[in-house]
Design a protein with these regions (language model features):
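Aromatic-lined carbohydrate-binding surfaces of glycoside hydrolases
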Residues: 1-231, 248-257, 284-308
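Generic structural signal for hydrophobic
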Residues: 54, 112, 237, 269-273
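Active-site clefts of carbohydrate-active enzymes
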Residues: 130, 234-268
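Glycine-enriched alpha-helix->loop->beta-strand junction motifs that scaffold or abut catalytic
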Residues: 209-218, 239-244, 277-279
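Extracytoplasmic/periplasmic substrate-binding proteins
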Residues: 219-222, 269-270, 276
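Carbohydrate-binding surfaces of carbohydrate-active enzymes
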Residues: 308-315
Length: 315
């Protein structure tokens, strides 16, 4: 349970005005709901207000999720003769060639489209840690997925091994499902692919996915090493074919107990994105006050490609 405001140190809880009956700090949906459904409905109402405010200010907004990540209760839906999922070390991986997996994926997308009909982008993220322990050869015993693998594995020349190629084909199938579903719904939302920037995550698959996916799908990728390293050089090559967004980190989530001076990182990474002819940069963060200098630097160079202030001048 969250800490009660009355227990905040040094009587700082006195500055918070809480709704009647609430003991913790948070939005009304979190602290006044009496059921899970009420909580979800209030959260969605709040996000509809956020979307409305964004559009009033000329800001476009994306919503999405990690594809192929579903609640464990759903795996009981498996039926005889259908290879719905493969077992991993600590989770189960849905098979995108299974009709059950496809319908669950469509339902998640439809929930966003129905709840936020004016959403600008649907952002699909390759799962950060989904494939540990999957037996690729066992997975390829499913004939529909095996056919997809044989047809598309050669696209992923940069992948390190058969397991990485497996993930590439798996991601490709999910992105194809998403793209076709958005078209079938007549949605105006554009599709974005995103993922983590580690060497065994999205970067090694991006060129293969670029070869296979329609060019109106936007590619994005978190910068590697919790943002301490710049975006890969090959994004410049992909940017010749489609819109590409780099994703610098205003702060890393492994050190949120202190300030993280990243002014020079933001300066260099945003300037590099301009040199690579990337279509955009998106910054991620957890806190709002602590990374303010990093954010100001990010915004300065993102809004003016000609900016060239030194780090000393920025501070």
């Amino acid at each position: 349970l969250p800490m009660a405001v009355k227990d905040f140190a040094f009587d700082t809880g006195k500055i918070f005005q809480l709704p009647v009956g609430a003991e913790a700090f948070g939005n009304n949906g979190s602290i006044t709901s009496h059921s899970s459904r009420e909580h979800y409905e209030k959260a969605q109402s709040l996000m509809r207000d956020v979307l409305k405010m964004a559009h009033e200010r000329g800001i476009r907004m994306a919503m999405g999720f990690e594809f192929g990540v579903i609640p464990p209760e759903y795996f009981s839906l498996n039926v005889a003769g259908d290879c719905f999922y493969w077992a991993g070390e600590s989770n189960m991986i849905p098979n995108p060639k299974s009709q059950i997996a496809a319908e669950i994926h469509y339902a998640a997308i439809d929930d966003i489209l129905n709840t936020y009909p004016d959403i600008d982008y649907i952002w699909m993220w390759l799962n950060e840690h989904s494939f540990m322990g999957v037996d690729v050869q066992k997975a390829l015993k499913d004939k529909p997925f095996a056919r997809a693998y044989q047809e598309n594995q050669a696209l992923f020349k940069e992948a390190a091994d058969s397991s990485a190629r497996f993930v590439g084909v798996w991601a490709l199938e999910y992105m194809k499902l998403t793209y076709k579903h958005l078209k079938s719904k007549g949605s105006r939302a554009k599709l974005i692919l995103g993922g983590w920037g580690g060497g065994h995550q999205l970067p090694s698959l991006l060129k293969g996915l670029d070869r296979a996916l329609p060019q109106d799908i936007i590619f994005s990728c978190l910068n590697p090493d919790l943002g301490k390293s710049p975006q890969p050089d090959f994004l410049e090559e992909i940017a010749r074919n489609r819109s590409v967004w780099a994703v610098p980190w205003l702060e890393g989530d492994h050190q949120l107990w202190h300030f993280q001076p990243r002014v020079n990182m933001m300066r260099e990474q945003v300037k590099l994105a301009a040199e690579q002819n990337l279509d955009g940069v998106i910054a991620i963060h957890w806190r709002t006050e602590e990374p303010r200098f990093n954010f100001r630097t990010f915004a300065r160079f993102a809004s003016d490609k000609g900016a060239d202030e030194s780090v000393d001048q920025l501070y």
